[in-house]
Amino acid sequence: LYLEDTKSETIILDDNKIKSSDYSTDLGYGFRAVTGDVVAYSHSNEISDRSLKNSSQNLKSSLKGKRGIYNTEIKNTNQKFYNDIDPVEEKSLKSKIDILNEINNYARSLDSSVKQVTANFLGEKKNIEILRSGGQLLNDERPLVRFNVSVMVEKNGRKETGVYGVGGRQSYDVYLENENWKKVCDEAFRIATTNLDSKPSPAGE
């Protein structure tokens, strides 16, 4: 039995204002039973006693007449790779919006050629539990953050865009503390200006 509970948040700044701020939750489970070369699945977005019992009965019906052996020799290799931080809750919505506005102002101040800036945050926290038929319970918590900046520059009627982003299964602070976000803006701007100064490749004859 595999159970998953996920909550996520996306905040987008575009054209000098917050374009959208979305929050969503998703949960569900999946049953899997294997007997010989026969595999049966059952899943639902509703986690309740009734739903779990129905799924269990469906699996039993699918594997009726089949007999399997429970494998107790599987070794526990689980390791804790991520911290317990919740990116969705670690900072208030206001503080995230304030940082996005700082990013917007900084990127626009890099050069007069900067005409448009888009920046967004994505935060996610996923909780997972796996219950094996022998009663063994395994669980994991997986944070995820993503931070992207897009800079559009214009010169002599020509427009080019540079996009750069960072992310990983850790806290926002890794990318935002000590104004580390400026490095992301600088790289997006560098890519945009490099594209702006580029020349067309020679055409074949």
Which ranges hold each PLM region?
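Active-site bordering "gate/hinge" segments
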Residues: 1-205
